A protein has these predicted regions:
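Short secondary-structure transition/capping segments
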Residues: 10-16, 45, 69-74, 102-118
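Glycine-rich beta-to-alpha active-site loop
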Residues: 1-30
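Charged, glycine-interspersed solvent-exposed loop segments at helix/strand-loop junctions
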Residues: 24-98
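Residue-level marker of positions within ordered structural domains that often coincide
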Residues: 12-13, 56, 85, 194
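A generic "folded-domain core" signal
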Residues: 89-248
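Functionally engaged cysteine thiol sites
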Residues: 1-7, 41-42, 122-128, 228
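Charged, low-complexity, helix-prone segments enriched in Lys/Glu/Asp/Gln
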Residues: 14, 44-48, 220-228
């Protein structure tokens, strides 16, 4: 790879190309990344170590190089995000869950260029509660809340129903709002690539918030749903029916 590529990949926040902008790898550097004798594609150890240090999966380059034999490879928006070559201002999502007596709490967190996005899921005997923390700084949070007309969650780009009337609130430097979930909604959230938390602006055309992909870090919370099932009582519709033998 040439110096420009190394500089780009070495950035903490890497934006994917939009509009007429393009990012690519040129011929002389592609040859050094391809294994000529076997026809297979590989990433040299020094390059792989650099990519790993930058938080990038070397396997992304392997797939990219294997997709074409051209002397110039252009990368599009979707490819760069899927292969984690670009993060568009968001560092990798993390999830933390440690089973303990009492409510089961799962936390998703992601550092972004202008703050932090955090989601907590709490399973208690009263039910499942989903809470969003949109940290954008005290001044910005106050500005957004002054224009807020409502807040909502999405799973797979669909608003979580039923709609809630509760307004978002300010907690330190974060915009915070919560809502209850059913166990079915919890299962959908844990397995989705797109879960969103949004605040509506009063002009109706703008919303503020973030999305995360819980399923991408599913190995960090094994057993969470099963633990919740043990904590949250079944609704009458879910509980197994008891069959009483008729009197003889």
């Amino acid at each position: 790879m040439d110096a420009c590529t190394f500089v780009y990949l070495g950035g903490l926040y890497r934006w994917s190309p939009t509009g007429t902008d393009r990012i690519g790898l040129r011929g002389p550097y592609l040859a050094s990344l391809r294994t000529q004798k076997t026809g297979q594609t590989s990433v040299p150890n020094d390059v792989s170590a650099y990519l790993t240090a930058m938080g990038i999966r070397a396997a992304g380059f392997t797939r990219m190089l294997a997709s074409s034999n051209d002397t110039m490879i252009w990368l599009n928006y979707d490819q760069m995000l899927a292969w984690e070559l670009a993060n568009n201002g968001r560092l990798p999502l993390s999830a933390s869950y440690q089973r303990a007596p009492g409510p089961a709490t799962l936390t998703f967190a992601q550092v972004v260029r202008d703050g932090e996005n955090r989601i907590t899921l709490v399973c208690a005997p009263e039910g499942v509660t989903l809470t969003s923390y949109y940290r954008v700084g005290l001044v910005r949070a106050r500005q957004l809340l002054a224009r807020e007309t409502g807040s909502y969650f999405e799973i797979d780009h669909q608003e979580v129903l039923p709609q809630q009337s509760a307004r978002a609130r300010l907690v330190n430097d974060a915009i915070v709002f919560s809502r209850p979930l059913s166990m079915g909604q919890l299962a959908s959230l844990l397995s989705t690539y797109s879960m969103g938390a949004w605040v509506k602006d009063k002009n109706g055309a703008v919303r503020y918030g973030f999305t995360i992909g819980p399923v991408t870090v599913k190995d960090s919370f094994p057993g969470y749903y099963a633990d919740c099932e043990k904590i949250v009582p079944r609704s009458p519709a879910q509980a197994p029916r008891q069959v009483v033998a008729p009197n003889t």
